[in-house]
């Protein structure tokens, strides 16, 4: 394990108020890993610090650093934590050359404040990924590795260059660790370092529901409490037939149609409920405002 690589990995602890919208789903205390991308900036998976009132960053030396702010990007699933002072040892971020199936990789993570663990393997897939929480990537990295610790740590190539952030363990569905390409962070780096949100024109419509692709179509497996879909009356078990009359097949097409709209726009969802088609008018929300 290269020393610089292991020294760049930090432990994160986040405290979330019980009143925050993410608390019932993700919990009020979360732990994760992150990677230093500069002396004072730590990159991690965004759900670890989503809604956090307090975040602690602990380096490999066991010392806790004070956090100035966190900046989230819902589209990529990444977050940048900014420290009050910078003494971390950053890792090398190099998106090029891009990883390909078969390339050797390794990940580093934490199991506690001082404990670091790693795993090595190979890339199995680089390509589109869709998830049921209104999240989609055009390019995700799948590997053969099972994450031996907490989410949010870095994925390295054989030359110890950061290529991604390990977000999820997907062993239950036949895939192993999923990583978000570091290029997605570099595209947003300046904004995240400034703690800025995307402009209103850049924000996507958000409905607050959990669609699942099935043999029968796109089924609603649940709704976010207090979210736009719940307010509109969308129900678990509904089958999505179309959006404003446009037929949708699969999560990718569904999300692309939704994301053509912005927050505040009305979207008519035609759903099959029981044996009848119903139209549910959903006033699209702003994920940044809902989860602020």
Region annotations inferred by a language model:
Residues 94-98, 154, 159, 222, ...:
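A short glycine-leucine-enriched loop at secondary-structure breakpoints
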Residues 10-12, 34, 40, 44, ...:
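Terminal peptide-recognition signature
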Residues 1-2, 158, 162-215, 256, ...:
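C-terminal cap/linker of serine protease catalytic domains
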Residues 17-19, 31, 36-117, 139-140, ...:
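Conserved active-site neighborhood of the chymotrypsin/trypsin-like protease fold
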Residues 193-197, 201, 219, 230-235, ...:
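PDZ-domain C-terminal substructure recognizer with occasional recognition of PDZ-binding tails
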Residues 4-25, 107:
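A short, Trp-centered hydrophobic/proline-enriched beta-strand micro-motif
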Residues 8, 20, 84-90, 117-175, ...:
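Active-site region of chymotrypsin-like
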Residues 27, 91-136, 171-177, 189-202:
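Flexible, gly/ser-rich surface segments that form the specificity/activation loops bordering the active-site cleft
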């Amino acid at each position: 394990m290269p020393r610089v690589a292991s020294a760049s990995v930090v432990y994160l602890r986040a405290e979330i108020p019980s009143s925050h919208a993410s608390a019932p789903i993700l919990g009020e205390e979360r732990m994760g890993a992150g990677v230093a991308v500069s002396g004072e900036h730590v990159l991690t998976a965004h759900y670890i610090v989503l809604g956090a009132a307090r975040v602690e960053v602990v380096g490999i030396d066991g010392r806790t650093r004070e956090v100035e702010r966190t900046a989230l990007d819902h589209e990529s699933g990444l977050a940048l934590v900014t420290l009050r002072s910078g003494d971390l040892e950053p890792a090398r971020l190099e998106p090029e050359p891009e990883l390909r199936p078969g390339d050797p990789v390794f990940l580093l993570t934490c199991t506690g404040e001082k404990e670091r663990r790693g795993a090595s393997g190979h890339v199995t897939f680089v390509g589109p990924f869709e998830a049921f929480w209104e999240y989609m990537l055009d390019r995700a990295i799948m590997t053969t590795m099972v994450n031996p610790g907490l989410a949010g740590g870095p994925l390295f190539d054989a030359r110890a260059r950061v290529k991604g952030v390990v977000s999820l363990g997907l062993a239950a569905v036949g895939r192993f660790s999923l990583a978000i390409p570091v290029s997605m962070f570099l595209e947003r780096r300046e904004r995240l370092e400034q703690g800025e949100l995307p402009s209103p024109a850049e924000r996507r419509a958000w409905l607050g529901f959990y669609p699942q692709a099935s043999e029968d179509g796109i089924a609603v497996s649940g709704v976010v409490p207090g979210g736009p879909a719940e307010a509109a009356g969308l129900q678990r078990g509904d089958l999505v037939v179309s959006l404003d009359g446009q037929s949708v097949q699969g999560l990718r097409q569904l999300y692309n149609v939704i994301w053509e709209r912005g927050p505040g726009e009305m979207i008519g969802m035609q759903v099959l409920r029981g044996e009848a088609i119903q139209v549910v008018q959903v006033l699209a929300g702003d994920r940044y405002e809902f989860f602020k």
